[in-house]
Swiss-Prot record:
The gene is rsmA. Its main location: cytoplasm. HAMAP family: 16SrRNA_methyltr_A (MF_00607). Its EC number is 2.1.1.182. It comes from Alkaliphilus oremlandii (strain OhILAs) (Clostridium oremlandii (strain OhILAs)). S-adenosyl-L-methionine binds at N28, L30, G55, E76, D101, N125. GO terms for molecular function: 16S rRNA (adenine(1518)-N(6)/adenine(1519)-N(6))-dimethyltransferase activity; RNA binding. This is Ribosomal RNA small subunit methyltransferase A. One of its GO terms (cellular component) is cytosol. Pfam families: RrnaAD. Belongs to the class I-like SAM-binding methyltransferase superfamily. rRNA adenine N(6)-methyltransferase family. RsmA subfamily. Specifically dimethylates two adjacent adenosines (A1518 and A1519) in the loop of a conserved hairpin near the 3'-end of 16S rRNA in the 30S particle. May play a critical role in biogenesis of 30S subunits. It comes from the Bacteria.
Length: 287
């Protein structure tokens, strides 16, 4: 197959179609074959897999995925890329391209229509401005996929896998780790993209858990607690939770924190996901 991942080939395609990179869509195309191979390796793509690729660009990564997977559904928001993808992926009968915004799709319905009962994985080179909304859509909607392998800004990847007591630990860390096991696969320098982004990138794989990391009575309460606790990082738990969106009374908080064996003077950034689970469940009994 005619690979398009070299700088020369990519520039030829961009010039042929007079393609204009969109800053608002955060478009950067990969031009390093080793990185592309490493992404597909890291995603553990095998013959029986069905892959949803978000943001195929001109199809460089798509080609590599298609050579290993059973079938690929590429979701591209930019309609000006569709004719380019028809050319670059024309030799791959196992690839279907749809011009859609993944954030507006009913992903359960899509998978039921395209890949019923199949092993589905997601691979994406995401624009940095929509990284978190897209990832959380797959996680919160409990879309039936095995894993998400995503290229994102290094700082966001660091936050996703951070643990208690570290500067990167926050609400995003807990949200991602509630639904999945995150694993950083490789660092990607700006030099392997056209045009070069101003930030370093990281490829991270989120292996979706069969059941959430902790068992909670009310997920909404669990995540509201986490949000309030990290909303005022420098405050003690007692003060952060009593002045957050939940507007909890200090007397109730003292009772629930004591029952959870958590010191009221600790900060939210020191609690494990398990401790947040215990706290949320004890609070649920009182509300």
């Amino acid at each position: 197959m005619d690979r398009i991942s070299s700088p020369k080939k990519t520039k030829e395609i961009v010039q042929k179609y007079e393609f204009k990179f969109s800053k608002s869509l955060g478009q950067n195309f990969l031009i390093d074959q080793n990185i592309l191979d490493n992404i597909v390796d890291g995603a553990n793509v095998s013959e029986g897999d069905c892959i949803i690729e978000v943001g195929p660009g001109i199809g460089s990564l798509t080609q590599n995925i298609a050579e290993r997977a059973d079938s690929v559904l590429a979701v591209e928001i930019d309609k000006t890329l569709i004719p380019i993808l028809k050319e670059t992926l024309g030799a791959y009968p196992n690839v279907e391209v749809i011009n859609e915004d993944v954030l507006k799709l009913d992903l359960h319905k899509l998978i039921e229509e395209k890949f019923p009962g199949r092993n589905v994985k997601v691979i994406a080179n995401l624009p940095y401005y929509v990284t978190t909304p897209i990832i959380m859509k797959f996680l919160e909607e409990k879309v039936p996929v095995k894993s998400l392998t995503i290229m994102i800004q290094k700082e966001v990847a660091d936050r996703m896998q951070a643990g208690p007591g570290t500067k990167d630990y926050g609400a995003l860390s807990i949200a991602v780790q509630y639904y999945s096991n995150p694993k950083i696969l490789l660092k990607v320098p700006p030099s392997v993209f056209i045009p070069q982004p101003k930030v370093e990138s990281t490829v991270i794989r989120l292996d979706i858990l069969d059941t959430p990391k902790v068992s909670v009575e009310r997920e909404d309460l669990f995540f509201s607690l986490v949000k309030d606790a990290f909303g005022k990082r420098r405050k003690t738990l007692l003060n952060a939770l009593s002045t957050g969106d939940l507007k909890l009374e200090k007397s109730l908080l003292r009772e629930v924190l004591a029952a959870s064996n958590i010191d009221e003077n600790r900060r939210g950034e020191t609690l494990t996901i398990e401790e947040y689970g215990v706290l949320a469940n004890n609070l649920a009994k009182k509300l």
